[in-house]
Every structure is written in structure tokens, then in C-alpha cells.
């Protein structure tokens, strides 16, 4: 599979998974994973960004992603990025930060960056505080290549 084909598959999956979902401002949720993916500088970052919320926010599974041709190293990264409802947010962030998985750390940084931008634009103070704190925690692990 070519890089372009993989990106197209990820885009199709994300679009189907988030169909009909709206964010806090009433905009289609798909705009967020698209923005996160487009911050990526390589195919793995783009695909992971597009798919980073799919399992957490839909009925899709990691097995389904593998069946669709998403490479196992990306699916493993998505497992790491998926926040279990039984896990505190701090534990979740620590798990990503200390994983040594650069793709997960970069994608989470992009996710937080876009969430922070949306929070500021929408005047969502609680979200801005949460995402600022999370970026402050993650910053030492994210060394901008």
C-alpha cells in the first residue's frame, strides 16, 4: 500500500467513525482529527492524527483498523493514545509521556495544540486550563525533533 492510499484509508475511517458527532461549539468533530493529522510531517503522523480518537469515540476497534490495513505500529500507537474511562487523565498523560513512543508523543502534542486553540477560540476556560497543564507536563518529552 502506498502512503497516499494509507492516508486515504485513514481519512475514510475517521470520517465514518465521527459522522454526526458535534464538538462543544456545535461543529463536526471530524474537523479536530483532520487538524491533528494535518499537523503531521510524515505519513505515520498524518494517519495517527486522523485516527487518534476513532476507537475512543466510536464503536470501531483496533482489530477493525488492522483489518482495514492500518499498520500494526500505528495501531499500537493508537492503543497508547486511547484514554480508558477507568484511567485518570494524569495517569493517561504519564503513560504516553514515558512510553518512549515518539509517534504517540508527537500526536498527543498536536492533539493538545489543536484542543488548546479550540478552547481559546470558544472561550472554554476549563478546557484551556486542562490542555495548557497537559502541554506543560508533556513539553519535556516533546523535543520538536
Task: State where each predicted segment sits.
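Active-site helical microenvironments for divalent-metal-assisted chemistry
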Residues: 1-145
Amino acid at each position: 500500500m502506498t502512503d497516499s492510499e494509507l492516508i486515504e484509508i485513514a481519512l475514510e475511517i475517521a470520517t465514518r467513525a465521527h459522522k454526526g458527532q458535534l464538538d462543544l461549539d456545535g461543529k463536526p468533530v471530524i474537523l479536530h482529527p483532520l487538524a491533528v493529522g494535518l499537523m503531521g510531517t510524515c505519513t505515520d503522523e498524518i494517519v495517527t492524527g486522523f485516527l487518534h480518537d476513532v476507537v475512543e469515540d466510536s464503536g470501531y476497534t483496533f482489530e477493525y483498523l488492522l483489518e482495514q490495513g492500518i499498520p500494526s505500529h500505528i495501531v499500537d500507537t493508537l492503543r497508547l493514545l486511547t484514554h480508558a474511562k477507568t484511567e485518570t487523565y494524569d495517569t493517561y498523560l504519564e503513560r504516553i509521556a514515558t512510553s518512549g513512543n515518539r509517534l504517540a508523543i508527537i500526536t498527543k502534542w498536536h492533539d493538545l495544540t489543536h484542543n488548546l486553540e479550540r478552547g481559546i477560540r470558544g472561550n472554554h476556560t476549563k478546557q484551556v486550563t486542562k490542555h495548557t497543564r497537559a502541554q506543560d507536563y508533556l513539553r519535556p518529552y516533546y523535543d520538536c525533533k
